[in-house]
Amino acid sequence: FRTDTDNEIVADSSSGGRTSYKNAGKTRRQGVELSVDQQFAGNWRAKAAWTWLDATYRSEVCGDATCEGNRIPGIARNMGFASLGWMPEEGWYAGADVRYMSNIMANDENSAKAPSYTVAGLNTGYKFNYGNWMMDLFGRVDNLFDRNYVGSVIVNESNNRYYEPAPGRNYGVGLSVAYQFN
């Protein structure tokens, strides 16, 4: 894919929780997305997805500094996801997944960036049907290895405090209930 944009509105500066915006002139986003979702050997299921995204300024936006050709801040160039799980239609299921995010520029000058990271997760649950009702009792653990990483950036933060931490290891449980009409 490839998209060229004129007068895109982007973050100019952020200070004290307030962000002002500006027109960036010309920008370009080009890349490739690939994915596979495959069931095999009965109830095993594998998924994988990868995105390469080159998002750049195509005209000057920095005033004193030269930013033409720089990466647009807040956008990762590479993102990946993979999972493998035992996924029967009913009964116990379980799986594992991994997510990757490449470094993310934090300012227009590309002088600050959040480092890349990889995190893993596990999930399990039990699905069952009762008449027209389908229930799924599930749980998952995210950031399984309790990695410290930057979860998001504040683009063009005026005090150079660009980085916001991601949550540590966290857990979730839930119940999904659905009714199928005949």
Regions found by a protein language model. Name each.
Residues 71-182:
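Conserved C-terminal beta-signal and adjacent last beta-strands/turns
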Residues 2, 22-107, 176-178:
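Gram-negative outer-membrane beta-barrel transporters
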Residues 1, 17, 27, 39, ...:
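Generic secretory/membrane-interface signal
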Residues 7-19, 53, 57-66, 105-112, ...:
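Outer-membrane beta-barrel translocator domains and adjoining extracellular loop/strand segments
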Residues 20-23, 162:
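Generic signature of intrinsically disordered, low-complexity, basic-rich segments
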Residues 2-4, 145:
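Flexible, active-site-proximal loop/turn residues at the rims of small-molecule/cofactor binding pockets
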